[in-house]
Amino acid sequence: MYKKQVMNKNKIIIVFSWILGAMLFGCSDSDANENNNSGDKGFTYSDVITAYDSFNEYLFQDSRQVYRRDAGSGTSEIAVGWTQAMMFDMTINAYKLTGDKKYMDLMERHFEGCSNEFTFDWYDYSHWDLYDDMMWWVGSLARAYLLTKDDKYLKISEDGFYRVWNGKPQSEGGHPLDKGSFDPNSGGMYWDWKFGRTGKMACINYPTIIAAMELYKATNNSEYLEKAKTVYKWASENLFNPVTG
């Protein structure tokens, strides 16, 4: 119910960012160098960037340096934390596609704004109260490190991955059920603790796989690779439908 309410509240920005993010993600550097056409979808890379620039014009809140909940909202109505991670990822993709410094600058500004709004103190329940919300950011920040080699992104990403995987000890004020997202007994990743560790959905398992692989690329630490394989195996057996794909 909680997740559904959040989705409804942010549906405009989320739906558009999913579409635009998928378009940007599908534009690899090598493809962009070969031509300016994205294939049989009927749009060019130039169209994608035009759409992205319009997205930023209407939804990026300059004074707070974060994204609005929707185009009609003022400075007090900003998109929730996990959707900000999606927008952060889009900026990385825009920079990789174009090499335009303005997107690198936007990424830095957005990071600063989100640092002010959400703190990136992963143990602060007032900002971070669901595992998947954190893991979306973990993967995005790992990608930012791979792009910039700026250690600030890697540290926050690694700290976030550790926190999600291991939980917050009760001795440090942790919730009794905040034992970490990973289930060492049955496998898979829980998306929550505050609602009673009620589900192991795609929204936490697959972002965990992606984040672990990005961190493996960033650090060459085989523990991330093994964690990615472990979660992928569980997700393939429990979440993937081989009939429908």
Label every PLM stretch briefly.
Residues 23-26:
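C-terminal motif of bacterial Sec signal peptides marking the signal peptidase cleavage site
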Residues 4-16:
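Bacterial N-terminal signal peptides that target proteins for export
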Residues 29-245:
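Glycan-recognition and catalytic cores of secretory/periplasmic carbohydrate-active enzymes
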Residues 19-21:
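Sec-dependent N-terminal signal peptides of Gram-positive bacterial secreted proteins and lipoproteins
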